[in-house]
């Protein structure tokens, strides 16, 4: 499998004749108006993660089923679930897809297909700080590059669809969290 395999559809691409289920355009407009009226407003996402053993953990988010996280066999996990970095990329893909859907709705474009393909080059030379290359600085760890490709179809030209994708990327909260340094604190209970 080449490094580009994950960025391309693996099945034959067929044009869908129906449109994706739309979001509430009126609700989106009200949410946008609220943001214009109070640009400093913030929400708080909360997650509670519990280790089961080895590297397998369960993250509880609201009333949803827990998100299971594990590491692959070559990193001493059991490979029963996506790795933490894959979960991060999943969040990025979900946020970009939400943004594309919102911007398309705002612009009056109906989407018939939307898929986001991501891959990221991640480094962990310090072995989580457990005796690896401890001389490496944090900027040399974690994602060093992320590549995203968006497959989008709808009732607009390629140019308009590309503008929608670029606009959604520019304003994506998760993409901006990854691109921009954010205050981060950690403490024990």
Language model segments and positions:
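Extended beta-strand/beta-hairpin segments
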Residues: 1-90, 100-189
């Amino acid at each position: 499998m080449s490094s580009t395999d994950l960025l391309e559809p693996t099945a034959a691409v067929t044009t869908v004749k129906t449109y994706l289920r739309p979001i509430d355009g009126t609700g989106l407009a009200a949410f946008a108006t609220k943001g214009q009226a109070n640009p400093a407003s913030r929400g708080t996402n909360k997650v509670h993660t519990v280790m089961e053993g080895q590297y397998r953990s369960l993250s509880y988010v609201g009333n949803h089923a827990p998100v299971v996280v594990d590491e692959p066999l070559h990193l001493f996990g059991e490979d029963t679930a996506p790795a933490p970095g894959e979960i991060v990329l999943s969040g990025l893909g979900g946020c970009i897809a939400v943004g594309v859907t919102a911007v398309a709705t705002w612009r009056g474009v109906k989407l018939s297909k939307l898929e986001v393909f991501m891959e990221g080059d991640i480094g962990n030379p310090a072995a989580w700080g457990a005796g690896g290359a401890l001389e490496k600085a944090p900027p040399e760890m974690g994602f060093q590059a992320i590549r995203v490709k968006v497959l989008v179809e709808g009732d607009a030209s390629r140019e308009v669809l590309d503008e929608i994708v670029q606009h959604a990327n520019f304003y994506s909260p998760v993409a901006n969290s990854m691109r921009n340094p954010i205050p981060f604190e950690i403490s024990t209970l």
